[in-house]
Amino acid sequence: EEIGGIVPAEGITYEEISPQEAFLVRELRRRLSEHMGESSCFMYTKADQFEDWVKQRENNGDRIFVARDEEKIIAFMELSDSAENFVTEHPSMKNICGAYCLPEYRGKNIFQNLLNYVILILSREGSLYLGVDYESMNPTAYYFWRKYFKPYTCSVTRRIDGGEDRC
C-alpha cells in the first residue's frame, strides 16, 4: 500500500512504536554500537557503558520509527526535540538522534522509505525541519545523510581530560 508517495517493498511496513516498546530496537542499537566500534570509526563502547546508554535511551521518551520485514524489525530511526547544538532547539524542528539499518537490507530503498515515512508523519504534525547529527568519521552515515540533508552547522571536539582521543 502506498503511503504518501512511499511504495514499500513487498512485506516491508513502516510504523512508529510506543516509548514502552523501545526495547524492541535494543538489538539494532547493539549492532549500531558495534558498527561505531569498527574501522573507520573506532568509537568503541564497553559492554557496561552500552547497557547504561541503552537503558537511558529506552527511558527517555524519544519517538522511534521502525521498518519491519513481516514481523522482524530491520531498521529504526529515533527522533528527539533537541540535539547537539542550539540551532536544534527550534519548536518546529525535530532531530534524528539514532538510526540503523541491518546491512542485508541496505541498498534496497528501505531506509530511504523509512526516512520518507518519518518526514510524512512530521509534516502532517506541523514540523518544518528535520535535522541529523552524525560522526564525520562514519563513512556510512556521511554518504547517506549528505544525500538527503544540507549541512547547516559544523562542530569539532577535542578531548581535554588526558584520555586517549580516538577521533
What are these regions (language model features)?
Residues C101, G107-R124, K147:
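Conserved acetyl-CoA-binding loop-helix of GNAT-fold acetyltransferases
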Residues E1-G11, Y142, R146-F149, T153-G163:
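Acyl-donor-binding surface of acyltransferase catalytic domains
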Residues T13-R30:
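A short beta-loop-alpha structural element at the N-terminal edge
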Residues D52-V66, N95, K150-T153:
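A short helix-loop-beta-strand connector motif used in the catalytic cores of GNAT acetyltransferases and
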Residues L122-Y134:
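Conserved GNAT acetyl-CoA-binding A-motif
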Residues E89-P103, T157:
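Conserved acetyl-CoA binding element of GNAT-fold acetyltransferases
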